[in-house]
């Protein structure tokens, strides 16, 4: 179910304020955030945002195609390490 139109898209205010200030100053620093649920706004295009995956911050470069999506969609939280080994071991009974 999508978010109500009357509420509008969610973005953490402090994150948006940092991006707006960087746009005014012309800076391109990496911004750390734990807010995976924030929606990507057009003001964020061209910036790198380090999104927390539960263990570390993963840098995500924001491009035009990402606008409208959530930050957490681009950082995986689970790593697949493979199924069990296929080696046959001989056991002495």
From Swiss-Prot:
GO terms for biological process: ribosomal small subunit assembly; translation. Keywords: Ribonucleoprotein, Ribosomal protein, RNA-binding, rRNA-binding. GO terms for cellular component: cytoplasm; small ribosomal subunit. It comes from the Bacteria. The keyword rRNA-binding applies. One of its GO terms (molecular function) is structural constituent of ribosome. The keyword Signal does not apply. Protein S19 forms a complex with S13 that binds strongly to the 16S ribosomal RNA. Belongs to the universal ribosomal protein uS19 family. This is Small ribosomal subunit protein uS19. It comes from Clostridium acetobutylicum (strain ATCC 824 / DSM 792 / JCM 1419 / IAM 19013 / LMG 5710 / NBRC 13948 / NRRL B-527 / VKM B-1787 / 2291 / W). The gene is rpsS.
